[in-house]
From Swiss-Prot:
GO terms for biological process: photosynthesis. It is a multi-pass membrane protein. GO terms for cellular component: photosystem I; plasma membrane-derived thylakoid membrane. Keywords: Membrane, Photosynthesis, Thylakoid, Transmembrane, Transmembrane helix. Belongs to the Ycf4 family. Seems to be required for the assembly of the photosystem I complex. It holds the Pfam family Ycf4. The chain crosses the membrane at residues 25-45, 62-82. This is Photosystem I assembly protein Ycf4. Coiled coil: none annotated. InterPro entries: PSI_Ycf4_assembly (IPR003359). It is found in: Cellular thylakoid membrane.
Length: 189
């Protein structure tokens, strides 16, 4: 699954949806952490109450200190980590869009954050302030494929989301399309 997905393409408007935390891997970890955390919590409580709360094993025979309390501790930690994953999915952290509008000569980057006063992070830049588009390609153990917008006085601003790096051809095509649309140079390819 790509980190940025084209949503609108026209002569005057180019808009890409950026996938935030709603990726398959986050769903997997939310389910795994919640299930594991709940299992460990029930095992720890079973050893404390001397009553079996799990249908597939008999943790009531465990000694509460140290085994039961350790399982309870790890179960609570796992459940909290699972809750965080579910909340990040619900809030769609990091999700948003990149919009390039020729009519207004503006670039709008929008991302979702944590709830509160500044939940929506919105950055706007003029076409005239854009120096170039830069593509970062790094292979190896921790691969990185990203597109950056180089803006005068602001440095490099990432346009791609986090997660699994998209295929090389997809990054190259997206970067070339955005560079043509903005009429700026493309660096790094």
């Amino acid at each position: 699954m790509s980190a940025i997905v084209p949503e609108i393409r026209s002569a005057d408007l180019l808009r890409y949806t950026v996938i935030g935390s709603r990726r398959p891997s986050v769903y997997f970890w939310a389910v795994a952490l919640t299930g594991g955390g709940l299992g460990f919590t029930l095992a720890g409580l079973s050893s404390y109450l001397h009553r079996n709360l799990l249908p597939f094993s008999d943790p009531a025979s465990l000694v509460f200190i140290p085994q039961g309390i350790a399982m309870l501790f790890y179960g609570v930690l796992g459940s909290l980590a699972g809750l965080y994953q579910w909340l990040s999915l619900y809030w769609n952290l990091g999700g948003g869009y990149n919009e390039f509008d020729r009519r207004t000569q503006k670039i709008t980057l929008v991302r979702q954050g944590f709830p509160g006063k500044n939940r929506e992070v919105r950055l706007e830049y003029d076409f005239a302030d854009v120096q170039s588009l830069r593509v970062e390609l790094r292979e190896g153990l921790n691969p990185r494929r990203a597109i950056y917008l180089r803006v005068k006085g602001r440095g490099d601003i990432p346009l791609t989301g986090v997660g699994q790096p998209p295929p090389l051809t997809e990054i190259e095509n997206q970067a070339a399309e955005i560079a043509r649309f903005l009429n700026v140079s493309l660096e790094g390819i």
